[in-house]
Amino acid sequence: LVWTVVPALFLAVIIIFGLRVWNDITTPASAEALKVELYAKQFDWTARYPGADGALGATDFRLINDGNPLGIVTRESVAMRLGELKAEIDAMDSTMHHGILPDVKVNELEARIAKLERTSARIVNLRTMMEQDIAEKGEASPYTHGADDVVIKEFHLPLRMEADIMVRSRDVIHSAYLPHMRAQMNAVPGMTTRIKMTPTISTDSMRTVTKNEAFDFILLCNKICGASHYNMQMPLVVESPADYKAWYAEAMKKPFQPSALPLAPAPAVSDSTVVAADTTAAMKVDTTATASLKN
């Protein structure tokens, strides 16, 4: 009986303790926790912090471009992306009608135009859904929170304050790995994963303990994500709440603002010239989602 009861009690203690720790790790962060997003792509990290409204805005991969690398959804970013797509379509359509092209090239351009038109239609649907959601929920709609988000290549956390870290990926599976924090979470395209953590020692304190003035906590990618995988690292600064507040106030001076790519001049066309489509052409549009293209 002893050989049965003692191991059973021992295992029960281990299991109960393990379940408590597991629940502490996996339960959602508190409502007061700092919200921050880590965005992975080949081959770097980007951080996003909420603006004055304290909430992160909605995102959509179809809005991603050089001016909006995280695909943040706002009325302006939707309008600008539609303008860019229209400019690309018009440029390729002009090439098809004014250039002398082989059939293979014409077929390629037609397929590309069809794809861009499908993307444009989906973004129009997104705009409709956004307007309906804003009309129903008002300021509670996630589509109203993106304009003041802070998109930055720095990662800061306040000391002894809970952080709710959302992790996303643009392209392949990455892994947000904070070795000093013993924390890791996969970054999976198409979904958002989360890490809940509370830093308990600051960067300055670690520099004192390690006697290394150059010490930094580090964010790494723990998946072999491509040829330049080694570039996926970003320092993490853990600082006092006062220092964090000062840094955050400075960062908020440069909120996210979607910017259109510059519209490249149309190439000259002659009877003997094959004109390549400029797939990076873009245009400026107004905030009412009305695009205009100057010929």
Positions of PLM-derived features:
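Non-transmembrane, membrane-proximal soluble domains of secreted or membrane proteins
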Residues: 1-295
